[in-house]
Regions:
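Conserved helicase motor core of SF1/SF2 NTP-dependent helicases
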Residues: 29, 92-104, 110-220, 224-319
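Residues that form generic nucleotide/phosphate-binding pockets
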Residues: 4, 46, 68-72, 83, ...
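Hydrophobic side chains in well-ordered alpha-helices
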Residues: 4, 42-43, 231-234
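P-loop NTP-binding catalytic core
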Residues: 74-99, 104-105
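A short, structured beta-strand/loop element
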Residues: 16-24
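Interdomain "pre-motor" coupling segment immediately N-terminal to P-loop NTPase/helicase cores
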Residues: 24-84
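Short amphipathic alpha-helix segments
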Residues: 2-17
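Short phosphate-engaging motifs
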Residues: 11, 39, 288
Length: 319
């Protein structure tokens, strides 16, 4: 029961909060009580599903409880089983990497089926991590010969020549999140050897200009901070037998005022083009601390209110 209830009963406390029920353990049996019969039935169904996953060796945590409740409310609880059937990749320590939400599963499927995939969504949805996992899997299966990871160094204005140190020292602060994910999947020593052989390349976006990248799995991270010109330049680097994943969060644009995000434009321009997928993740796909999900929802609601207020003010001026 400890694995089901979680540390300090956090899993069951969260289930109580989400479904407005009371859960207790009496004589070795789990008892669910509440004012709503539907809520009680839902909580019981979620608990049965979580227990079945535990019996299969899966780990139950608060992130999984949130996903299970969300699926239960949509009448899709049984789809939770399929999330654990597909191992995206394996870390160098042998831990399987799986999708944790339906949105993540659709994102991974889109990457598999398309040459170019845009992963759009807030922080904590696994956009970059899952793209990295897919890249490593493609490299191990010899579908590609190398991995190219890049992101715009917007904080430095891409004028890296003014910073002290060699190229690696200049760009490392901007590329550290990509290194972290790569180290977890391949191990630091393996990554270093692969970089020395050119199998893995990590570089700022400015260094992609003038190149054609063939037989490669290419990831552009933090793409909301590309300009329109940079995005077009990057997308036209694609060579034969390559796959590109572009990730970003349009709500976190750090470009100078007046500069339009290349990611925002690309999603509009390329929507509907064959072999290009645009996969949007939401707060429901956030798999970090539950407070992150609440923060994302709050900011989304604030942005919506601001948009409505702006629209109302503009309509008033027109009148």
């Amino acid at each position: 029961m400890q694995n089901l209830f979680g540390a300090g009963d956090e899993n069951m406390r969260l289930l109580e909060q989400l479904l407005d029920v009371r859960i207790s353990l009496r004589g070795g049996e789990i008892v669910v009580e509440g004012e709503s019969e539907r809520a009680v039935d839902g909580a019981q169904a979620v608990i049965r599903k979580l227990m079945a996953l535990l019996m299969r060796g899966e780990r139950v945590d608060t992130a999984l409880v949130r996903v299970a409740v969300g699926l239960c409310e949509k009448g899709e609880l049984d789809t939770l089983d399929t999330l654990f059937q597909d191992v995206v990749a394996t870390t160098f320590r042998g831990r399987p990497i799986r999708c944790k939400t339906i949105g993540q599963r659709e994102y991974v499927r889109a990457i598999r089926r398309h040459t170019l995939t845009f992963g759009i969504g807030p922080a904590g949805t696994g956009k970059t991590y899952l793209a990295m996992a897919m890249a490593v899997a493609a490299l191990k299966s010899k579908d590609v010969e190398r991995i190219v990871l890049t992101r715009p160094a917007v904080e430095a204005g891409e004028k890296l020549g003014f910073l002290p140190g060699d190229l690696s020292q200049k760009v490392d602060p901007y590329l550290r999140p990509l290194y972290d994910a790569m180290f977890e999947m391949l191990g630091a020593e393996t990554c270093q050897r692969m970089q020395e052989r050119g199998v893995i390349e990590v570089a700022p976006l400015a260094y992609m200009r003038g190149r054609t990248l063939s037989d490669a799995f290419i990831i552009l991270d933090e793409a909301q901070n590309t300009t329109q010109e940079q995005m077009k330049m990057f997308l036209t680097r694609m060579g034969f037998r390559s796959k590109i994943v572009v990730t970003g969060d349009p709500s976190q644009i750090d470009l100078p005022r007046g500069k339009r995000s290349g990611l925002v434009e690309a999603v509009q321009v390329l929507d509907g083009v064959p072999d290009i997928a645009i996969q949007r993740l939401t707060h429901e796909d956030v798999v970090r601390h539950e407070l992150v999900q609440a923060i994302v929802r709050a900011y989304d609601a604030h942005a919506l209110r601001a948009k409505e207020e702006y629209s109302d003010a503009r309509d008033g001026q027109v009148e």
